[in-house]
A protein has these predicted regions:
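Residue-level preference for alpha-helix termini and adjacent loops
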Residues: 1, 6, 12, 27, ...
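HotDog/MaoC-like acyl-thioester-processing domains
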Residues: 2-88, 157-160, 164-199
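Generic detector of short, locally flexible boundary/turn motifs and exposed helical patches
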Residues: 9-13, 21-22, 87-88, 95-98, ...
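Short secondary-structure boundary micro-motifs
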Residues: 11, 29-31, 105-106, 139-140, ...
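Catalytic strand-loop segment that frames the active site of acyl-thioester-processing enzymes
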Residues: 49-50, 61-124, 138
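Catalytic-pocket segment enriched in acidic/His residues
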Residues: 113-172, 176-190
Length: 199
């Protein structure tokens, strides 16, 4: 399961130009928690165009023993300066799985996710929530140039239950982002940015 990511934006990617991705496993750590053994794997993906690094994405992925899913949050979602409502349809989840080459059945196979994994419905991808959060941020701040974006999953969101993404400025060039619903916060994040034209 996706635990979180740290993205660094160095330069924009050019459409219709070749991109090289170099992926490296940078850390593997076993931990023991309330739900049993957990294996944390951190993978770094670096994207290059014309020999220059354009984007770096460090992903934290957790492998765990089968356990009942925790669906309730610990904190209510805050009131933000901007927010977008989302209704995650099964079609949206299927398409996101396809475009990201994500074959994990919890996102599109209803019998599997409900009968084998024990969730009440299809699980919304953590990166999809992050993508929707960045979209809401850039709609609210169209002149922002992204520098860094980090996010961490708190609990799963289930399709087709509505949720919202939103955020607020916390400093010059920094914003706090979140996603959640009536059950509480599901994802938290932070974006660093500068204002002005994209190079």
């Amino acid at each position: 399961m996706w635990a979180g990511s740290r993205l660094e934006f160095y330069q924009p990617l050019t459409v219709e130009a070749d991109v090289t991705c170099v992926s490296t496993i940078i850390n593997v750590e076993e931990k023991h928690g309330r739900t049993g053994s957990l294996l944390f794997v951190t993978v770094r993906h670096e994207y290059f165009q014309d020999g220059k690094r354009a984007l770096q994405d460090e992903q934290d992925i957790v492998y765990r023993e089968p356990t009942p899913p925790k669906l309730s949050g610990t904190e209510a979602i805050p009131q933000g300066q901007w927010r977008d409502p989302v209704v995650p349809s099964p079609t949206l989840l299927f398409r996101y799985s396809a475009v990201t080459f994500n074959g994990h059945r919890i996102h599109y196979d209803w019998p599997y996710v409900t009968q084998t994994e024990g969730y009440p419905g299809l699980v919304v991808h953590g990166p999809l929530i992050a993508t929707l959060n960045l979209r809401a941020f850039t709609k609210a701040h169209p002149n922002a140039r992204l520098k860094r974006f980090t996010f961490r999953g708190v609990r799963p969101l289930i399709s087709p239950q509505p949720f919202e993404v939103g955020g607020r400025l916390i400093d010059s060039g920094k914003a706090q982002l979140w996603a959640g619903n009536q059950d509480g916060t599901a994802q938290i994040g932070e974006v660093e940015f500068s204002l002005g034209e994209t190079p």
